[in-house]
Amino acid sequence: GTGSLIGQSIIKSIKNSEFSSDYNLIGFDYFKDTVGSFWCDKNYILPDFFKKNATENEWLKELTSKIIDEKIDILFVGVDFELIVLAENKINIEKETSCKVVVSDPQVINIGNDKYLTYEFLKNNNLSHPKTFLPNECDFDNLKWPVIVKPRIGARSRGVFKVQNKKDLLEKINMIYNPIIQEYIGNEFNEYTCGIIFLDGELKNKISLKRSLKEGNTFLSEHFRETNKKINDYIDSIAKLLKPYGSCNLQLRVDDKGIPKLFEINPRHSGTTYIRSLFGYNEVIFILKNILEK
């Protein structure tokens, strides 16, 4: 939505580019007067299907109606909870409206949303990964401390704890709904956010930023001309096996042996989307031109 950090990043990537005048921006959100709404030519309020007075079908009907009325050519997703709904209804929306919906397949969304499925995807494809356990398969007495405990479903570091011992771990497990226990990788100074663009069955472009976090979001990013080859090769392998559609964000750390290990997949644009455009990597414009100019 136009009020989300991701939505605003998408809008700013267009508005602050040399192609700004080429596009009319139609925004959607669940609240009036969001920051991003003032950067759009129009902004519509959608029914909130998390509330009792609205349903998912009503939401889809309203969205589809506005896409047709405004002759929208391409739809970007700026809110996490919309991803799976749009992924499951992408074919019908595109058939009914001729609007391209930039969202990955449901399988990709599920792998990204579920941290244990992320781990299984990496493990099953022989890619480096943090050791990851469900509580019922974890040997608490033989863990290497510290470890990370976090929700199986979640994003932006919500409910994520670094724990130093068994007592603390058991306490945190009881605080978290559907938790997983994960190996602690490297340190906070070796964390990267990596963006990829995957279209037409191939990896089109990528970027890696070293990042520092505040409240689960990136507040400081560093871009280096020479990116670690191991990270580059690792990203390439993940992208070609995962096969997302459009933009996908990969969070990883490099361990003490220099091995990159991914711990989170966000099959969507990132909060750093606009920051990346300042480094010459404007993924939104790239996708717009690749899809609309065919």
Regions found by a protein language model. Give the residues of each.
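Protein kinase-like catalytic core scaffold
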Residues: V147, K204, K261-E264
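ATP-binding N-terminal substructure of ATP-dependent carboxylate-amine bond-forming enzymes
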Residues: G1-V101
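Conserved residues at the C-terminal ends of beta-strands
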Residues: L46, G78, P135, L209, ...
